[in-house]
Amino acid sequence: MDAVHVRAPGKVNVFMRVGPLRHDGYHDVATAYQALSLYEDVRAYPADDISVTFAGGSVDTSALPTDGTNLAVKAAKLLAKRTGFTGGVRLEIDKRVPIAGGMGGGSADAAATLVACDALWGTELGREELLALAARLGADVPFALVGGTAIGTGRGDRLSPALATGQFHWVLAFAEGQLSTPTVYSELDRHRERHASEIPPAQRAPGVDAGVLQALRAGDAAMLAEVLSNDLQAPAIHLAPSIAEVLELGELNGALAGIVSGSGPTVAFLAADLDNALDVQIALSAARVRVVRATGPVHGARVLSD
């Protein structure tokens, strides 16, 4: 095989509850993921060793590592170790999902790499084995593999499918700068400690609200807008106050609701329909906010025929 092309989606967390800090430094979460039509493209070519380059796409990749710390390289090495494959791969990635933006772009790269290398190398691992490898790479990698709409528990990597009917329209606003996921979680812990007398304690076993599942099942954007929630939104805004301005701007210009995606700083605005999404996109663009429209749910990582 000369090359394999795999496309994997970014995601939005339409709901996210975060439990208290565990003794191992992690948090239990309960989240509702939706895969969006903002994709990462990974092309895998035969090679003697494992390497990655970035080409095309719409994201500045100049600061991204290309050594063994890159998540796509880690994915290829993990698959090679698991299967005993002794060759290599040259990975070429077109990035469209913002870096450190809360949309799982690096996770999409890793998921796409697992699928691409499995096909290129002929290792033919089953879906469950690929999911197990994905979970070892990061909490969001399994979802990038399966796509659609799903509930994530544990670190977010234990997935169960969630029925979502119809199509949801989103306008994604890319706030300036980047936010490190560990930094946002640490800020959440500090916020809870500072305001322990004012806010309810974190649920030790968080769950997704029934209203979220009902709205997704009904395919009702207005209903979903009422229940969008993210425990990481307040700490993300505290670290990057400009997020609050973007949220206000989108909602003033007709979005049903806005939510910080994951650990931010990307803000996802839910629109009533395509026309509403276009109106929000135009208004935010006029205010010099970088935006893109997307729909969901979409498929997870899969091989394309070029």
From Swiss-Prot:
GO molecular function: 4-(cytidine 5'-diphospho)-2-C-methyl-D-erythritol kinase activity; ATP binding
Residues where ATP binds: P98, I99, A100, G101, G102, M103, G104, G105, G106, S107, A108
Catalysed reactions, as listed in the record: 4-CDP-2-C-methyl-D-erythritol + ATP = 4-CDP-2-C-methyl-D-erythritol 2-phosphate + ADP + H(+)
UniProt-listed GO biological process terms: isopentenyl diphosphate biosynthetic process, methylerythritol 4-phosphate pathway; terpenoid biosynthetic process
UniProt keywords, alphabetically: ATP-binding, Isoprene biosynthesis, Kinase, Nucleotide-binding, Transferase
Pathway(s): Isoprenoid biosynthesis; isopentenyl diphosphate biosynthesis via DXP pathway; isopentenyl diphosphate from 1-deoxy-D-xylulose 5-phosphate: step 3/6
Enzyme class, first EC level, given as a word: transferase
Protein's UniProt keywords contain Calcium: no
Gene3D superfamilies per the UniProt record, alphabetical: 3.30.230.10, GHMP kinase, C-terminal domain
Highest rank taxon of the organism: Bacteria
EC number(s) reported in the record: 2.7.1.148
Function: Catalyzes the phosphorylation of the position 2 hydroxy group of 4-diphosphocytidyl-2C-methyl-D-erythritol.
Similarity remark: Belongs to the GHMP kinase family. IspE subfamily.
Protein name listed in UniProt: 4-diphosphocytidyl-2-C-methyl-D-erythritol kinase
Taxonomic source organism: Leifsonia xyli subsp. xyli (strain CTCB07)
